């Protein structure tokens, strides 16, 4: 997910994307806690995607 793609989305779409990413992060964390997560790099990728979405939302709020 690129920041350029995110900037093209509306605030409502970004909020929906954020909720989706937070749910995915929760599921990955539960898998990691129970020892079922094989691809641990996904946790880092989702965390950074959440940060990107929040950054773009902040930019749009200021503009």
Swiss-Prot record:
Superkingdom as given in the UniProt entry: Bacteria
Molecular functions per Gene Ontology: structural constituent of ribosome
Annotated CDD domains: Ribosomal_L29_HIP
InterPro entries: Ribosomal_protein_uL29 (IPR050063), Ribosomal_uL29 (IPR001854), Ribosomal_uL29_CS (IPR018254), Ribosomal_uL29_sf (IPR036049)
Keywords: Ribonucleoprotein, Ribosomal protein
Cross-referenced Pfam families: Ribosomal_L29
GO cellular component: cytosolic large ribosomal subunit
Keyword Ribosomal protein found: yes
Gene Ontology process terms (BP): translation
Family of the protein in this entry: Belongs to the universal ribosomal protein uL29 family.
Protein name as catalogued: Large ribosomal subunit protein uL29
Species: Photobacterium profundum (strain SS9)
Gene: rpmC
